Amino acid sequence: MNLTKQICHKAAHFDAVAFDVFDTLIKRDVAVPTGLFRLMGDDFYAARIRAEREARAAQSGEVTLAEIYARPCLARYDAAAECAAELAACAANKPVLDAVQTLKKQGKKLYYISDMYLPQTQIDAMLRRCGYPCFDGGFVSCTYGVQKRSGRLFKRFLQETGLTAKQLLFIGDSWRADVAGAALAGITAWHLPTPPAPADNDAAFVENRLPQQRSDGESLGFSVLGPLAAAFCQWLHARRAARPEARLYFLARDMYLMRDVYHTLYPQEETGYLQVSRRSLAPAFLAAGDWATVLAALPRQTLTGAQIAEYCGTTCPPELANRQLDLKQPDREALHAFLQQLPRPDTADAVTAYLSAQGIRPGDFLVDIGSGGTTQLLLERLLQFPLHGLQLSADDRLRTRFAPDQTEVFLFDGKPAPRLYWAGQPMLERLLSQDVGATLGYCTEKGGIVRVRTARQPAEPRIAQIQSGVRRFAAAWRDSVLNGQPIPPQRAIAPFLRLVESPTALQLELLGDLTVEDGGTYPLAAPQHTAHYLTHPRQARRDFAEARWKIGFLQRAVPLPLPYGKLYLKLKK
């Protein structure tokens, strides 16, 4: 039974239901209540903590907000600013909101009772903002000078409403103030089950909004990829602010979603979207006889002569079509000799025409998901001027090509990403990318207009749901009290790394059957039934080799409570 149904079931035999407010009806987008003060500045935080301590020491009953702000240390601050921050930081506890709405329709009398220094008008405003229907009454300790924990506020409630203790159910999250305090007044109370306290403000923000997501895919995008996308875009924005004359270009397809998030967070800014790929650029290098750069553009795997020719936008002599060439550990002389025998690609000039039309200038920012900086390398050689790379991650090739002042990296302190990240990187790329086929090349049409050619690719509904969740995170963050607060890189990537190493059954179901492109089309983690592999061990090896999320493959193939992530990483050492 979910929480909403539990509340309605518990309330069925009572005429009236009263609720605690904070952490019951309402949650805040901060890990602890005083975290809101810290968002308002360190000086205010120190003064506000001191003022409340002094106000409580000066009297025995509950204090009011006015009494707190009457302390000399808060003389230069306005209570209205704190009230505005409280209003901005509040979020409905969605299961409780749903229960309150149901109970209202059933004709129950509904009240709230809170130990709080905020005035009742402020609490009413926060409840309205969170979507709660009008309550039949509210009782706040600072109004009456008595608290729940002593039982006296509950007794005052019964006196004011004329209800008997037997008519009322009280629901709250505190055993001491809510359950024990209500019992002192003879009132039945139910302790609201609560999750562990959030680790930080970002976690509180996510937890408060997860119940509002419309599908499992949206929830995954919101909680796992939303913080990463927002944090990366914050970092991009800071770099652009340092050099406002430089334009920001996001690379297709990998940075499609990141560009959407950037525009959500910073709608006033213009950016570019470069529809380029290593494959789309390769014809220009083949035409120029730049064999070393053609090799850099080619995928690092074994391909046939026909596959290499197609990749470079040309045809292969029949006698070379079936020749196998290892591009991961290439024989450079043999490869150069092969490339010399390929005809000049017809589309080579269209490559430079497309780039010329984009208005790229020296020093402009190039935003990429990143590994070895290959696309930046290719573009710089074609454009014949330097760009400034901004990558999400990097491998150990990057610093052999670009210095830190030429290409910056967001994750892992700019160092090569760890094995666990690469174990899930193909999945990350798929989830962030525009859900269209790869950029294959360019065609020059009448009037010199260059048309981009892309591969056919059917839309994947799960990708759309996940990306919708990421966009919803960005919009919610922009409109929240946390907007402007940086999300640290290590905090931003942590949910994704947890998913890669220890996915839940639901995450495996959502993601495992997705496919990725990697010189071919491969499943992320789609094993056949375990029983099939017991009689076909070679098939098991082939399927495992093809899986691009091997930890997920193992967990789906043999669903036992084993640390597959740790086992896989040990095997990779």
Where would I find each of the regions flagged by the language model?
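Hydrophobic transmembrane helix bundles of membrane-integrated enzymes that assemble
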Residues: 2, 89, 124-126, 131, ...
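Conserved phosphoryl-transfer catalytic core
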Residues: 31-59, 292-309
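Short, acidic loop-to-helix structural element flanking the phosphoryl-transfer center
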Residues: 62-67, 71-112
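Substrate-recognition "cap/lid" segment bordering the active-site pocket of phosphatases
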Residues: 111-113, 117-168
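Long, low-complexity, Lys/Arg-enriched
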Residues: 155, 159-161, 168-171, 179-180, ...
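Short, surface-exposed acidic
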Residues: 42-51, 73-85, 131-139, 167, ...
